Amino acid sequence: FYHIDFSFDDLRLGGSAFAQSLNKVGSDVPICKNPEYFRDAFDAVQTLVNKGLVLAGHDISAGGLITTLLEMCFANMEGGMEISLDKFGRHDIVKILLAENPGVVVQIADKHKAEFKKIMDDAGVGYLKLGHPTDERLIQVTKDGAEYQFGIDYLRDVWYSTSYLLDRKQSMNGRAKARFENYKMQPLEMVFN
């Protein structure tokens, strides 16, 4: 897994879902400091996709990096991730996990690692190696020797229970409960032509 930053900005919590959960908005919001860099990062990711190098990917937006990682795992019924945040440097873990600076996380097969790095380096786009998939149904995050574990299935239940409560109020067909009771039994299968 690799983190590709589109903002070229410091990690900021203003305007984030995290700030809102604390009844704040904040004025220190992430911006895109360099539009040309943003374009180059976007184009580099498109090259990766067009060459078939991306096994999985997700944008970093509402909820930040931790939400991105969780959402990448929610659709699967097996496996997790081992993630190291040490390459983010001196940033605190709250900002690393919850800042909503524009970017993406992509999964690249080991056999394509050199080609991935060449494409990114040739485009002048920064990236950080985050980690790799695991068999265990957890996202294990380490930073400066501290370890944090996020139970994917538990957090998926929390996530979907909120969606269910909203669906129950919005759905006119009375099927919200059936959808909620069934969501775990629908593994995601995709075929691309």
Where are these regions (language model features)?
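Intein/HINT protein-splicing elements and their conserved insertion hotspots or analogous self-processing inserts
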Residues: 1-98, 109-193
